[in-house]
Structures are given as C-alpha cells and as structure tokens.
C-alpha cells in the first residue's frame, strides 16, 4: 500500500467484526502475534506489555483461535492491530458477536487503549446506544440521513 498524506500503510488498521478472521486457525495466537510484531519491526516484548493492559493472560498465547472465548479473541485482535502502532483504527461492528457484558468491556477497552496509544477510531455500528456512549462525531448513513460531522446525541436522537 502506498503512503497517503505522509502516513505509512500500517497507520490504518481494521478491527474485524469477526475476530476469527484476524487469525489463522492452524497457528497458535502467540506465533501469529510474534509474526505480526516481526513483520512490522516491533519487539516481541510489546506483546507481553499489551497483554495485561487488555486483561489477557499470557497462557492464551499457547492456544489456537478456536480455543478461546469470543471476548478474549476480540481483545487479542485489538492487541494484534496495536502491535503496529496505528494512527486510525477502523472498527467494523467490533462488538456484534459478543454478549452485553463483554460488549461493554471490549468497547471500553478499545476507547481507553486508543486514547493511551494516541490513535483515532472510526466506529461502524448499528447500535445507537453504543454510538451515543462512544462517539464525539457521527456520520449517519441511511435512506433519510446523510449527516456529516454532527454531535453524537443529536444523531442518536434522530435515529431513535
């Protein structure tokens, strides 16, 4: 990918709606994360540093993607993209396959981590409550709406 506006291709990272798509099934999570770190010139120690921030146990790295919970896998997917130090995270329905408690944990973690790492989040969501709780600015798309750069409460009120 070419540099756009002076940013490296790794400046933009996607947090998958289905975290299973972020990991090869045949490889341990630790090996996948180590490969990502190496490919992007990051020390593998960054993996260990991010694990506790994301509430993850190091033992998870010895497992394959199918052997961890959905919430754990989504947090590991977040760790995966944070390894490359993105400037923008494109989060496409990042909580859609999670139970309500895990949804809140993952979105809170995403927002806290993005703030700590100094990156922006582009959140795609069909959940007005989630948008109201997390967004500073909203672009609402639909048959009756194409509102750009308006505050979240105004758009959420119009959507309900």
What are these regions (language model features)?
Residues 18, 25-41:
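Q-loop/switch helix immediately C-terminal to the Walker
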Residues 78, 90:
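Hydrophobic anchor residue at the start of the ABC signature
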Residues 125-126:
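H-loop/switch region of ABC-family ATPase nucleotide-binding domains
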Residues 104-117:
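Helical segment within the ABC ATPase nucleotide-binding domain
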Residues 1-13, 27, 39:
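ABC ATPase NBD coupling module
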Residues 64-68, 72:
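Conserved ABC ATPase signature
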Residues 44-59:
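Conserved ABC ATPase "signature" region
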